[in-house]
Amino acid sequence: MSDPLLDAADFTDDGLIPAIVQDAETDQVLMMAYMTAETLQETLDTGRMVYWSRSRQERWVKGQTSGHTQTVEEARLDCDGDTLLFRVHQEGGACHTGFRSCFHRRAADDGWTTDGEKVFDPDAVYE
């Protein structure tokens, strides 16, 4: 049996759809990644975020290496059907650089500034 969200999602010609990930408790935008129909279905089936890595050309379960998992609280589809929004419970940091959010850089008059502190050491996690 197919899922209504999967049926309504409009994937690109290369089989991908962007997924924006937001903290369900704080509303902070954590990251954006891509999904395939298969990783979307796995996410819906398991309640854990599963993505498609464009650089490695393989699926990846968020937190499988780092332990910084994302548990789905809610899934949404935008008005055009071509972008997903997941509200998640984030364990640890979402960003592979060690920050809670991948959007930790903010434009300032003199360049970029960093918001927040690292919540983990990526060198210790990704050896």
Swiss-Prot record:
Keywords: Amino-acid biosynthesis, Cytoplasm, Histidine biosynthesis, Hydrolase, Magnesium, Metal-binding, Zinc. It catalyses: 1-(5-phospho-beta-D-ribosyl)-5'-AMP + H2O = 1-(5-phospho-beta-D-ribosyl)-5-[(5-phospho-beta-D-ribosylamino)methylideneamino]imidazole-4-carboxamide. The keyword Lipid biosynthesis does not apply. Its EC number is 3.5.4.19. It is found in: Cytoplasm. Pathway: Amino-acid biosynthesis; L-histidine biosynthesis; L-histidine from 5-phospho-alpha-D-ribose 1-diphosphate: step 3/9. GO terms for biological process: L-histidine biosynthetic process. This is Phosphoribosyl-AMP cyclohydrolase. GO terms for cellular component: cytoplasm. It comes from Salinibacter ruber (strain DSM 13855 / M31).
